[in-house]
Every structure is written in C-alpha cells, then in structure tokens.
C-alpha cells in the first residue's frame, strides 16, 4: 500500500501539472508535507512517535497518538481495544523511562502533572507515580524490566507490526489498486502469450509430421480442454449412409478430427499450408469475405470427405491432396470443380429438410451443435448471391477462440435487458415479468440480488459513478433507483403523467445526470406485429418526450426539443465524456444532441420505420444503427449524418422476435434492449440470431461485413446482447426468449 500511495501522489502531481492547475498543485504539495499519515509508511509513523519522545515533546506525543486513534484505530472492532490500550500505556512508559535515563526528572514530573487526571484511576499506573522519586529505578524489581534494551526493542517492533497489519487490512480507494491491477494484467498477458506460443508450436510440429508423411498414425499431444471442445463436429447434416462410411474411415485416421483445428491456425504461424488443406467455409459459395465458426468448417470438411468415400475409388485416390500431397494442376482443377458441385448439392437443402434429417437420424445429438449446424445451413441458403464459386484465396484465421460457454438460467420468461456494469463484474438482467436479477460475471455466476416489480418494467441502466445503483423505467411513468448491494429501492420518481412508458434510460458518464425517454400509452403496432399505423410522412407516429434529470437531486433539469413533432425515442447512448447524446426514434430519425448547449445539433432520416438500436463507433466519428427495415447502417456525424455503409441483416437479428409453440401458440416480442455490441477496439460486432449470437467483422473501409463466428447455444431467439471485455478475454452475453442467458468467453488471437 505504501508504494501505491507514493505512485498515486506522483500521478496526481503529473496530472495537475499537465492540466495547469498550479494553485491546486501547490496546496497539494503543502498537504503532503504536513501529512500526519506519513503516506501510510509505518516506519515514518514510528519514527515520528520516537522523535516526540526524544525531544521531550509530551503535548506533541499525546496529540499525535490521539490523531492515530481517530484516524486509524477507531475503525477497528472492539476486540482490539485492549491491544490499543496496552500500546498506549507502553508508549507513555517508554517516554518516562527515557526521561529518567537522560536525567530529565523535571520532564517526568511534568508528565504526571499533565496526565495524572487520566492515569490516577488506572491500576497499572499506581506504582509509576513514585518513579521520579526513586534514586535508582533501574535496579528496582518493578521497573528494572522497562529499563532494559530488550524491552524497548520489543515495544518498537510490536508497534511497527501492529500498524503494518492495520494498513494491510484497511480498505483503500480504487485508485490505489491501479498498480496491483496493472501487474495482474501484465501477468495474465504474459501467461496468455506463453500458452499461445505453446499452441503454435504444437500445431507447427503436427504440420511438420504430416508433411513428412509418417507410415503409422500420429500420436498427438493432449490438447487443452477448450481446444478439444471447439473441434466437435456438427455431423447432423450428413445422411446415415455417409455417417457409417465416414466412421469406418475415421477408425484408420484418428488424427484427422484434431488436425482440423490445428490446420486452421497455420496462418497464424506464417507458414504456408499444404495445397488444398484449407477448405472453404459453408458461406463461401454465396458470400465472399465471410467466415463461420470453426466447428462448422470441420463439419463441412468431413461431409465432403464422406461424399468422396461414397463416390468410389477415384475420389479415394485423390484424397492425398487433402492431406497436403501435391498433384498435377489439371487434377487439382478437376477436383476443385467436383467439390464445388458437391457443395452446391449440400447447400441446396432447405432448413426444413435439414431439420427433418436431424429428427430422424440425430435425435440424441447435442442440442448446441444441432442449432449451430442448422443456423449455418440457413445462413448459407438465405444469404445473397454475392459471389459465385469457391474462394481461391486462403481463408483468414479465426479472430477468436471460444474458451467456454456458460448458462445463467434464473429467469423463467423472455429477457428484455441484459447489461454489464461499468466495472465488468456484475450483470443486471430484466425479464418481461418484471423480475430483476443482479449476478456476478467473474468466477461463479452467483445471484447477488433479486427483485420483482409490481408494475411492468421497460428499461434498465447502470449508474456510471456509483456502479452499485440501477435505474429502472416502468410502464406507469416512474423511474426507480435501486441499490444492488443494500437490495432496496432508494427512491421512485414520477416522470410524465401523460407519457407513462419509459422506453429508454441513459446515464451520463459524468454521473451527474441521466436521460429519460417517455412515450404515450402502448400503440397497436407494439402488440400486433401485422399492424402498422403510419402518418403522412410514412412514419410510426407515437408521441413522446426526452427529458434530462439530475442524479443527485432526482429533479428534472430540462426537456429536449424534438423536431418536427414530439416523438417517442426508442434508444439513447452517450459518447465517452457525455458531451454528445445520440437517439433513435419511432419516426425513423436519428438525432444528435449537444449536451453542453442542450440542443439538437444534427438530425437525419435513417430508417424506414422505427430505429431500434443506436450507438457510437469506437473512435466516435460515426454512429451505427439498426432499424425496423432490417438495415444496419453506419453514419458519419462530421458530414451531417452522411451514410458510410449499409448492410441488410437477417430478420432474426433485428426483430420483431417470434417464438412458436404447440397448438398454434405464438409469442411476439419487439426489441427493447441492445441489438448489437462492439468489442473493446470496435473492430467486431455482436448481433442477435435465432439460435445464438453472431459476431461480424467491421472492415475499416466499410465495404463488407464479414461473418466471423456464430456462438450458438440457444433454443429460442436471442433478443438482446452485450459484450464485456477484460484483458484479451471477452465475455459475450446473449439473452433469449426462453429466459436463458449464455456467457461465451472468447480469447482474441493476435494477428
């Protein structure tokens, strides 16, 4: 703690100098020089006490000990009171012994004159009042122990140890943990780099052995648990006859299943892969530049190999090309053409046909793998015809490794919001029944707090400065401030009587205020997915207000002007310093507000229909939005909302979300929470889908949107997402309509 205090003091000085706060810096340095805590250095505190003793400054000694009692000892439990009293008694006796040893009996008389009122009723001091009058107190049986060098050293060591333990157990502010956190992060980064190098060395060795062509099956090193799990195959796409033929072949080649994962990482080691060893992904015939999760690539690869085995000896004889044995150019062209035809036949199956095969042949297969395989096939079928034929260039390596996927299953109805707090340690989730769950993200997923709202809740937001507080917006026009540690409501305020629905809440990064979006009562378009009521301008006309509230006083500061007419605002987001606020409304407009002037700086028509979700880019030079029209659009805020890029997302990524059941049961949910989230560098985006989250890569030029990874794991449509990053590992949160929340931990691979 001592080093942390000194480092923090230096950082504060550097910051004040950088900002030009010279007066504050002068006062800060003066306070440091007069610091009675001595920077929480135990040796300096003990030295100060001994200095008072050696200078016979009784008043200074008594006052400094009283300060330590108020500042430090008062925080201790009552069980430590006797120890503190013994230390104080020993300190005063040390002072008296020093005065007698230095022949200053006048100072001993002064001590008893000033402290007699306090000490005369204490039994341990009755014999000490005679000390100044004894001719040789060091030979007295009662006082001889205190005149020994051993007792003096024992006392100073005991006082030093007591203060050291006290400082170690004393709670410290977060700023003092900066150095220790930095060291932990550096240690984790070093461990990650070591593990990555081991993994690359393993796959390089495997590549070398396979290139040499051993006559016996390879015996690979045991891979980590998460690596072996990532290489599981989604074999549900294959027929039973192909499955049996493929399993017989696998008995002779036990290393093929593991090598699929290792070969995909060869590009990371900057070594050229053998010809034809990297197979195109499922999405390659219909979309250039896309990529899919690793296990899906292996599934397609195994399907192609199985087809070759069933096809006859000609395909079997050509299989060495798959293992990296070079062939003639003509045979490679013919084989590429055949594989392209086989992939087209495989992808010609519709989603329903795949589902029928899965029910008939793989009823006991893993549900996560089945859903991932189905999602991959549907994506391949429904995706646009952007490219024809297989990709000839090498497929880039996967940007993430899936370390684990856990499930939080405390909710029993559809999730509306799922947000990580500013510290990245806790998650707040809200379902349609008004149940709020606060649970830990690091380590074991343990529920910290739980509450049920009598009135329906529509919005949720973490407070920024005091991250223990949660803002909850209801359907009856109130905003509730909930303390997640005390597990109680601190206050509940009414917003607007005629605008009961609190659609969105956004807390300023400064923590001084929050923005609240209130809207009129539920419109038909929010309950019936087939009903749309548009005004003359072709927009959904739902009246609403956008208000700014003070967080401390919980009073309204102002109401923003929404032009041309007051309209319901569905989503809000601040930039990093709270100077800008972006909103998406029911009329399809995006509005950018200057929070210093409290005025609308920019507004533009963004979507046909409502804007569902909006957020700033990583560099805050652009704004991204998802609307009712199914478009994901990037806007340049420096060019009056000029469109930079536009992409069409699947309907299961934008909503409305639909869940069907038995006897014609159908549940429809309109978007409420975040529909997309970025990683720590803003290069990758997480979106919703019918079977799990999907990660896209955002190219810097805005030309393409690459599908990088499908997380899967859900049986119901995902309705909201969030992405929490810590060091190189990030946690993706995907919440679905069946109340399940999946936490997928990813490890980013360095390019």
Curated annotation (Swiss-Prot):
Chief location bin: membrane
Region: Disordered, residue numbers: 237-398
Subcellular locations according to the entry: Early endosome membrane; Late endosome membrane
Amino acid composition bias (Polar residues), ranges on this chain: 238-267
Highest taxon, organism lineage: Eukaryota
A single GO BP: early endosome to late endosome transport
Bias (Basic and acidic residues) ranges: 356-373
Keywords per UniProt: Coiled coil, Endosome, Membrane, Repeat, WD repeat
Positions annotated as WD repeat: 410-449, 452-492, 517-559, 564-603, 606-645, 668-706, 713-751
Entry's Gene Ontology molecular function annotations: phosphatidylinositol 3-kinase inhibitor activity
Membrane topology listed for this record: Peripheral membrane protein
Coiled coil start-end: 183-205
One GO location term (cellular component): cytosol
Descriptive protein name: WD repeat-containing protein 91
Organism (species): Xenopus tropicalis (Western clawed frog)
Encoding gene, per UniProt annotation: wdr91
